């Protein structure tokens, strides 16, 4: 099982999300703790680092993980738009 870190900026990202969507997002994040690469995850390269994006309806969950340290960092949760993608 992976440890989970959520960036402070994610709290701002989720302020305006309705309760039902927020519950589904939280469920997907819980799944990441056990499987950091579930079906449907897209690998994104930015510079020399790799990030991953998980789709949840109209929302995207951006994260990165370190398998050696068993750590997952949630970077953003955003409604799908042009600025969503890194």
Feature locations, PLM:
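Residue-level recognition of specific faces of alpha-helices
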Residues: 13, 28, 40-43, 73
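A short, surface-exposed loop/turn module that caps and links secondary-structure elements
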Residues: 30-53
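Compact soluble domain cores
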Residues: 21-33
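Enriched for short, Lys/Arg-rich terminal
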Residues: 1-5, 9-12, 16, 20-23, ...
